[in-house]
Amino acid sequence: MGVVRFGVSLEKETMDELDNYVTANKFPNRSQAIRNLIEKYAVEQKWNCDNEVAGAIVIVYDHHKRNIDNEINEVQHDHHELILSTQHVHLSHETCLESIVVKGKANELTELADKILSLKGIHHGKLIMTRA
């Protein structure tokens, strides 16, 4: 994919906000920051549709909570067509972190994440999506 140069006219306040964004996120230049913002916008537009996206559901939970491991596995098996892989990490004697790599329609991934995150015993979790 080739690079196309173009000029942009902005109000001073907007330019200052862009420069603050560049600095805060350690972009090497404004072009990289604008590219990142456009990519983020494009990805978010895909979330609002039935487009295919990829992502990860990351959860932290107490594995001593009665039957939580089985409940998580059951939800995953019910949606196996969306799950590419999982990684289970023991953070402490009681607490586990699980990363579930997913791919499918954005609304299906959101529904899957909601089912997992609503299980009793999940301390925290988040769905992160990007374009597939």
Predicted segments with their positions:
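Solvent-exposed residues in well-ordered beta-strands and their adjoining turns
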Residues: 11, 62, 103-105
